[in-house]
Amino acid sequence: MNKTSLPQIDSLERQWYLVDAENKTLGRLATEVAAVLRGKNNPSFTPHLDTGDFVVVVNAEKIRVSGSKPTQKLYRRHSGRPGGMKTETFEALQDRIPERIVEKAIKGMLPHNALGRQMFRKLKVYKGSEHPHAAQKPQPLQLNPSASAQ
């Protein structure tokens, strides 16, 4: 009987990818980035190990959603105190903290456990086209053409 070989985590070569979110649809971009963070694009993918790569997302303020979502999609957060529920629309959050929209969409597509939190730490989202990870030489990640908003 053959024994399944597992990749050694310390021997994995982690790549850095750069994604430009300008005029991309939020959900379509998030699914592809989440797959790269999980490592689903690697031949050494193992569900219970973090084999994913690093992803840098720039131009988070230029992400798009379809239909009436800019005015109707709500983001909720709670302070933990009685009556501490805060609700904000997509437009308002995009004006205030556009990085949080992309982060929340991608985080919801990762496993909801300690492994998912570890994968989420490899995501870097920035407003504008500048980022501090030039030393890692991130390669542009080719997204599916349907991710671009019409």
UniProtKB/Swiss-Prot annotation:
This is Large ribosomal subunit protein uL13. Residues 139-150 have a biased composition (Polar residues). The keyword Ribonucleoprotein applies. GO terms for biological process: negative regulation of translation; translation. It comes from Parasynechococcus marenigrum (strain WH8102). This protein is one of the early assembly proteins of the 50S ribosomal subunit, although it is not seen to bind rRNA by itself. It is important during the early stages of 50S assembly. Residues 128-150 are annotated as: Disordered. Coiled coil: none annotated. Belongs to the universal ribosomal protein uL13 family. The keyword Ribonucleoprotein applies. InterPro entries: Ribosomal_uL13, Ribosomal_uL13_bac-type, Ribosomal_uL13_CS, Ribosomal_uL13_sf. GO terms for molecular function: mRNA binding; structural constituent of ribosome. GO terms for cellular component: cytosolic large ribosomal subunit. Part of the 50S ribosomal subunit. Keywords: Ribonucleoprotein, Ribosomal protein.
